[in-house]
Amino acid sequence: MSTLEIFAEDGTKLSETTDGGTITGVLAEIGVNFERWPTRGLSADAKGDAILAAYAPEVEWLKARGGYQSIDVVSVAPDHPDRATMRTKFLSEHTHAEDEVRFFVRGEGLFTLHAVGRVWNVLCCEGDLMSVPAGMTHWFDMGAAPNFTAIRMFVNPDGWVAAFTGSDIAERFPRYEPA
């Protein structure tokens, strides 16, 4: 279930909700787009082209709205040989010169935003669209045994390009450990 937890920078939990409308509204206040899309009931073995075809209307709408030029599908399973390296790549606080847009087709992952003196944990699940605005500091944790498929959208054809902040704040907050 999608969850939003808000913390002070010292780690004190300030609030938590699983209500989709509340999550959308609260995140909009800091410039983050969060939406719930209907899922398509794709087979567990559906791959990139089939996934993109199933969500073509939504993807085209987002491309037109955001100017995205590069669209792909990423799938990471618990037995992926590079899962630990992939996880580490995203765990440090960073920014991007463009929005970071992800739609979770399957599974889940934890986006953590660092904005306006707060830390915002957003557990994204199947059917969640998350758009972190350009320049917002954040990190992403897929967990030690990741199991998700997501559609990614980029303006830059080179894809994911991060500028790491050098802050250790991500190390001071719990990692994503699914139940």
How would you name each of these model-derived features?
Residues 124-144:
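Conserved metal-binding segment of the jelly-roll/cupin
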Residues 73-97:
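Conserved short histidine dyad/triad with adjacent acidic residue
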Residues 6, 36, 72-75, 152:
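Structural signal for conserved beta-strand scaffold positions within catalytic alpha/beta enzyme cores
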